[in-house]
Amino acid sequence: YFASQKVNEFILDLRYNNGGLLSCAELLCTMLAPSSALGQELGYLEFNNRFNPQIVPFTLNSGLIGNGANLNLNTLYVLTSSQTASASEMVINCLAPYMDVVIIGGTTVGKNVGSRNFSSPELMITMNPIVCKIYNSEGKSDYESGFQPAYSGYVVNEMSDMSRFLPFGDTNEALLSTALGAIDGSIQPPAQE
C-alpha cells in the first residue's frame, strides 16, 4: 500500500514497543531501507564460545518481503520513549549505516542483546536467557545507555504536557507533531559547522 501511494517520508512509532523477534525486525528493516542496500549485511549476532557458529549474520533480504514492497527511504523518523527496547533498538542501530535515522522522543532502554527460549516440559519451566549481542553491519553495538535524539528540539516527553497526549495519528500529538515539523522543516536542528 505505502509504495503504491509513493510514500517518501515515513514515521515509525516505536515508543511503546519493547522488542520482539529478530525476524520481524529484519523484515521491517528490509521494507524501509534504501533499495541500494538490499542484499547487504544488516548486522550480526555474536554468541559466546559455547555456541557454534559464534557469529550469525543477517541481511537486508528482499525475499522476505514477498508480495510487499521496499519503500527505498533515505530518512526514517523514529518515535521513541523509555519503553523502546531490544528489537526496536536493533532496527535503529542496523538501519543507521544505510540511511539517516532521526530519533524523536525519549531515550531508549539500551538493550543490545538477544535471548533464546528454552523450555523443559518435564520440569515445567521456560527460560529466556541472554545469549548474544547484536551488532550492525559496521560492527557497532554501543547503545547500552540507549539511543537518544541528536538534537534537543527532538527530545519530547509526551507526559509533560497532557494537553498534547492525544490519540495516535492526531497531528497535534506531541511526538507526531515534532516528527511532522522535522519533515516539513518547521523544526530544524542547528546548522552543522
Task: Provide a role label for each language-model segment.
Residues 2-9, 17-193:
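C-terminal "post-core" interaction segments
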